[in-house]
Design a protein with these regions (language model features):
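Conserved glycine-rich cofactor-binding loop
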Residues: 10-11
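Active-site helix of classical SDR
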Residues: 109, 145, 153
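Conserved glycine-rich Rossmann-like NAD(P)H-binding loop of the short-chain dehydrogenase/reductase
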Residues: 24-39
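Residue(s) in the substrate-gating loop at a strand-loop-helix junction
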Residues: 129
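C-terminal substrate-recognition "lid" of short-chain dehydrogenase/reductases
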Residues: 106, 199-226, 231
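Catalytic Tyr-X3-Lys loop
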Residues: 80, 87-106, 121, 125, ...
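Substrate-binding pocket helix/loop in short-chain dehydrogenase/reductase
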Residues: 85-86, 93-98, 180, 187, ...
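Alpha-helical segment proximal to the catalytic Tyr-Lys
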Residues: 114, 158-162
Length: 232
């Protein structure tokens, strides 16, 4: 049975990915930072193994991966955001966003890569954002990290393709998760109307795209927008 490792799997898009990959027949493990109760609930529901780990900590990632089966599919979903003017972002906030959103991918890829290289096969799916494509006012740091994810995805696809390893990413639009929990309902409604499909997305919408990319054997270096047409 193929093994999928999903980061940030205790809630939102990550939890939906755990469910989707389990339903698709994968053995699934997931990393989570601190929400023990949510992680336990997802694990009990799906049978997936949960490991507490901050992906910004390189050694913690290596230790976590060493406890798990070899990874066939790595889903780099863990991410955080910050809303505010660029002049109001502290150095610590800036550094933390890059440490998690970009550094976390670096650490997780390097942790699973030796086994993938040995097998000459593997699949890596990163999570960017439509704001990584076009930028968002008051989300400069978040947009910058997600733009970096897009560039990293393409570079890794070039580098790892000759070794049989595919690297792609998904770029969610407005998805109804905890990340938008503080957005006023009327603002969410306005955002929905800006998308040609006239609605906001769900975590399951993104998870379905991830499962597709995991099985798309001739697709690499691509960004799959999941945004209802918000950004074309």
């Amino acid at each position: 049975m193929r093994h999928a490792l999903i980061t940030g799997g205790s809630r939102g898009i990550g939890a939906a990915a755990v469910r989707a990959f389990t339903a698709a027949g994968y053995a699934v493990s997931f990393l989570y930072e601190k929400n023990d109760a949510a992680a336990a609930a997802v694990s009990a529901e799906t049978g997936a193994e949960a490991v507490r780990c901050d992906v910004a900590d390189a050694q913690a990632v290596l230790d976590a991966v060493s406890r798990l089966p070899e990874t066939d599919v790595l889903v780099n979903n863990a991410g955080i955001c910050h809303y505010g003017l660029i002049s109001q972002i502290t150095q610590a906030q800036w550094d933390r966003l890059f440490a998690v959103n970009v550094g976390g991918i670096y650490h997780c890829v390097n942790a699973v890569l030796p086994a993938m290289l040995h097998r000459q096969s593997g699949c890596i799916i990163n999570v960017s954002s439509m704001w990584g494509q076009v930028g968002a006012s008051c989300e400069a740091c978040y947009s910058a990290t997600k733009g970096a994810v897009l560039a990293l995805t393409k570079a890794l696809a070039q580098e790892l393709g000759p070794s049989g390893i595919r690297v792609n990413c998904v770029s969610p639009g407005v998805i109804l998760t905890d990340m938008v929990a503080n957005v006023a309902p009327e603002v969410l409604a306005e955002l929905a109307q800006e998308a040609p499909l006239g609605k906001n997305g769900t975590p399951e919408d993104v998870a379905q795209a991830m499962v597709y990319l995991a099985g798309a054997g001739f697709v690499t270096g691509q960004n799959l927008p999941v945004n209802g047409g918000f950004v074309l």
